[in-house]
From Swiss-Prot:
GO CC aspect terms: membrane
Primary location recorded for the protein, binned into one broad class: membrane
Parts of the chain that traverse the membrane: 11-31, 101-121, 198-218, 286-306
UniProt lineage: Eukaryota, Amoebozoa, Evosea, Eumycetozoa, Dictyostelia
Region (Disordered): 148-179
Domain of life where this protein originates: Eukaryota
Name of the protein in question: Uncharacterized transmembrane protein DDB_G0284909
Cytoplasmic-facing ranges: 1-10, 122-197, 307-337
PANTHER family, per database record: LIM ZINC-BINDING DOMAIN-CONTAINING PROTEIN-RELATED (PTHR36911)
Record's compositionally biased regions (Low complexity): 148-167
Subcellular location: Membrane
Keywords: Membrane, Transmembrane, Transmembrane helix
Membrane topology: Multi-pass membrane protein
Amino acid sequence: MKLKINIRPNEIIFLICIVVIFSFSYTLTYFDSPIFKEHYITNNGNDFGVENHFVTYHSTYKEDIHKRIIDPHHGLIQEITKTFYPVSSPLEKLFSFSDNILIVLIIVQVIVGFLIFLLSVEKLSKCNYQLKSIFSTKSTFYINNNNNNNNEDINNNNNNNNNNNNKNKNDERNNEEIEDEETIRKEKILIIKKKRDILLAIIIFFLVLLGVLTIIYVSFIPLNIRKAFIGQQFYYKGSIDPLCADISNEGDHHIGKCKSLNGRIGNVNDKIFGYSWSLDSGLFNVKIVFFSTILIEFLTGCLILLMKFKKDPNIVPLTKPSIASPTQIPHLFCIAK
């Protein structure tokens, strides 16, 4: 068996582009999005001021809920800001559209993975020129018919050695049957090639669709956050306890930061702020897309390599159909190019 691996440059570029795209998308999942900016709380004597610095999207639809909690024992003031977008909001519609794309993307990935898996297994298990399809029965019929005809010809030749005219007629008939068998075999190979081209076209179509959906979904990653944004800020009126500590959560993941001259809030210039873009469920979805796409890339690469395996066409008899059998008919992806 001859092994020829001939990978074209465009195939290498295609695989590199896929890896780069999903590596970039994976990096984005751990990147702090600047969609929601910091919320500053500054000390101003016995009072405080709240400065909300949002990078607003569709501010007309945005609704804020403020809640202030004062701890009388420690003088801790907790400001909770919850920002959400109604159903009529364009951003809310964008979230829904992104979720729908994710569902379609996962479905397409399942289809592509299933097709590539089947074709890869079929390639590995049936490259011994075994054809188990509707053609096998017909092939057996034709081959058995030819074998019977050949046996009859041999008997006629043995019984009529002195009859040259009959022998010539039998030879002509055998030649015609050989030509017919070779024609039938070539037609079957042509049909097999057409089946292969159709399946490859289906795979290419789904791969292109997968790429388009993935690019669209990756472009939505910075906005693929939870529908509600919750931010918490803390302000301590005294200067006896450090405030640059963990900021507690309010039903969502948060990223909290504190900026102070001495690690405590007690001066006018000291400020504490926190921001979040909550990717708890979104991060899980992105990881699903990332790892499932890596699996699709692996299966696609295996299929591309398997498609490059070529057998010596001399193994398949082209001029002696009388000794051919169904196991000698090239299979779907085992035809030498």
